[in-house]
Amino acid sequence: MASSNFIDYVKVCCRSGKGGAGAVHFRKEKHTPLGGPDGGNGGRGGHIILRGNVQLWTLLHLKYTKHIMAEDGERGGTNRASGAQGKDQIVEVPLGTIARDPETGEKIAEITEDGQEIILIPAGRGGLGNEQFKTSTNQAPHYAQPGEPGIEAWVILELKVLADVGLVGFPNAGKSTLLSKVSAAKPEIADYAFTTLAPNLGVVKYRDYRSFIMADIPGIIEGAAEGKGLGIRFLRHIERNSILLFLIAADSKDIRAEYEILLNELQKYNPELLHKDRILAISKSDMLDDELKAELKKELPKGVETVFFSSYLNQGLTELKDLLWTTMNKPKSDFME
């Protein structure tokens, strides 16, 4: 997914349809030129509706859409006929999309399932026709209700990538290479920092036709929570991942220190992230023999599953997938220290 095509934040002005006016009408029959009231009700306007679409990964299709409008309802007819309803405006969004009020930041709606629909902006109701106002004391009402106006409001749509596993690490930790090895995703890979400028998603095939989603989140650096590097823009995507897979290269100067920096950035951004299951994966492990791995394990944090792998030699990838799958499907327990 090219970074220029990955849009995870848009602000749009939405206007639901206004309701149609009720009709003022009286029956006109051959032998009853001035019959009773038969004005129909107006039709409701169209809603603005969010719909989840599993085929979408970005809000790119809404980037240049500043106004979203639904149809107005039609006025009531004669012979008690109701006016037609305005057509709803369906806005398809990726799973993980949240709608917020731009003034308060309050969450209005959240889409997490394919085909899920939520009315984002409700339509105006149609007005009642004069037939509805007939009473024993007023057999010929000459008035009807106007339709309710539609609602116009600015809305922020924010995407938080839904994935089972989120890759967390410094730039150049080998996250994109790993994703390309265990899935069909083709992220850009190069020997310089911030190659990944937007989250990349890949479907990891597992045993017996099972699979899970892995997300390569752009590299985190110290100070990311304060906006350094690519800043907090992409940290929010980690919030939707079930497991955080920390990737640190075997040739790092201090693996434990890097791990602690990454944890600290997540803690500063959102302490709830530390309640998620996490696994520490040491990449480029072809540089280490068994003795070095054993020594290294002694220095690493206790209580955190650690796995060594090499994308270059395809070593340890099966074990890594096994560990991810097992962790993903175990009963939830207290968070790790």
Swiss-Prot record:
One record GO biological process: ribosome biogenesis
Broad class of enzyme this protein falls into: hydrolase
Any Gene Ontology CC annotation: cytoplasm
Residue span(s) of domain Obg: 4-162
Record's subcellular location: Cytoplasm
UniProt main location, coarse: cytoplasm
Keyword Magnesium assigned: yes
InterPro entries xrefs: G_OBG (IPR031167), GTP-bd (IPR006073), GTP-bd_Obg/CgtA (IPR014100), GTP1-OBG_CS (IPR006074), GTP1_OBG_dom (IPR006169), GTP1_OBG_dom_sf (IPR036726), OBG_GTPase (IPR045086), P-loop_NTPase (IPR027417)
Chain positions recorded as GTP binding sites: 169-176, 194-198, 216-219, 283-286, 310-312
The EC number(s) this enzyme carries: 3.6.5.-
Entry-linked SUPFAM superfamilies: Obg GTP-binding protein N-terminal domain, P-loop containing nucleoside triphosphate hydrolases
Top-rank taxon, per record: Bacteria
Alphabetical keyword list: Cytoplasm, GTP-binding, Hydrolase, Magnesium, Metal-binding, Nucleotide-binding
Positions with a binding annotation for Mg(2+): S176, T196
Domain OBG-type G residues, every copy: 163-329
Cofactor(s) annotated in UniProt: Mg(2+)
PROSITE patterns from the UniProt entry: G_OBG (PS51710), GTP1_OBG (PS00905), OBG (PS51883)
Pfam families xrefs: GTP1_OBG (PF01018), MMR_HSR1 (PF01926)
Single GO MF descriptor: magnesium ion binding
Function: An essential GTPase which binds GTP, GDP and possibly (p)ppGpp with moderate affinity, with high nucleotide exchange rates and a fairly low GTP hydrolysis rate. Plays a role in control of the cell cycle, stress response, ribosome biogenesis and in those bacteria that undergo differentiation, in morphogenesis control.
Cited HAMAP family: GTPase_Obg
UniProt subunit comment: Monomer.
Family: Belongs to the TRAFAC class OBG-HflX-like GTPase superfamily. OBG GTPase family.
Name this protein carries in UniProt: GTPase Obg
Gene source species: Cytophaga hutchinsonii (strain ATCC 33406 / DSM 1761 / CIP 103989 / NBRC 15051 / NCIMB 9469 / D465)
